[in-house]
Structures are given as C-alpha cells and as structure tokens.
C-alpha cells in the first residue's frame, strides 16, 4: 500500500488506511506500506497518515495483531535529494522465523552507498535547534 500513490497521486484517508488494516487483521495478511512520499503532500486539506500510527490508534488488538512493514527512502524528494540511494524498513509483528530469513536475504546484498545512508540518518534524526546545522536544514 502507498498512503500517497506515487508523487502525483492521491493521499489515502485515515479511514481508508483503517479499512485496509482491518482487512489485513481479519485475513491475517502482511501489509507493506510504501511511505516514501510522506513529506510530499502539498494541499492544505490533505494529510499524510502513517500506517503504524493508524494501527496504534486502532488499539492493542490490531497493533499487536497485524504484520506491517513500513518503507522510507531518501530517494523521493524530502528536500531535493533525489538520486541518493538510502532507505530503511521497519518491521512490526513479523513471525520471528520469517524475519530471520528477511535479515539473511538483506545481509547478502551489496552494501548501500554511504552518502545515501548518511542522508537517511539526517532525515530520521534531523538537527535540533541548538545544533550548528539546524539553520541550514
């Protein structure tokens, strides 16, 4: 699922995401949420909703019962950094044996480029007000 269907697409409503998560819960499905465009919502009446946050707000039964993989990347235009190759995925409630195989699969791939991973670090942990680079960020 993509809460924002590609860069020119529509933004999914919270209700739509709740319906997807409810369906995944009922059918025991893994949800893969492509959230790389979360910072590219420009209309005032549209808002990005994280699948994980919506899942949490649905209560412990859902939050602890839905397998969710959430993706984010530096390659999709946070501040014009397209071309950097860096990203991460967060795994929630995945069967430990499946997660072990996923880690194994990811471990045998080539290492990502350092500049992209450095950019990803800044996106997930931006400079704080008291830090020298805050004004430039």
For each feature predicted by the language model, list its residue ranges:
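PLP-dependent aspartate aminotransferase-fold enzymes
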Residues: 1-3
């Amino acid at each position: 699922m993509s809460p924002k269907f590609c860069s020119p697409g529509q933004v999914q409503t919270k209700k739509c995401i709740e319906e997807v998560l409810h369906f995944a819960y009922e059918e025991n499905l893994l949800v893969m949420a492509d959230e790389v465009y979360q910072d590219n919502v420009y209309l005032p009446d549209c808002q990005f909703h994280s699948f994980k946050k919506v899942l949490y707000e649905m209560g412990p039964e859902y939050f602890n019962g839905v397998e969710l993989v959430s993706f984010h990347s530096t390659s999709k235009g946070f501040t014009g950094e397209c071309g950097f190759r860096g990203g991460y995925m967060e795994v929630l409630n995945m069967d430990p044996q499946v997660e072990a195989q996923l880690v194994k699969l990811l471990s045998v791939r080539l290492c990502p480029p350092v500049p992209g991973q450095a950019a990803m670090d800044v996106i997930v942990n931006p400079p704080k007000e008291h830090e020298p680079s805050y004004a430039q960020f």
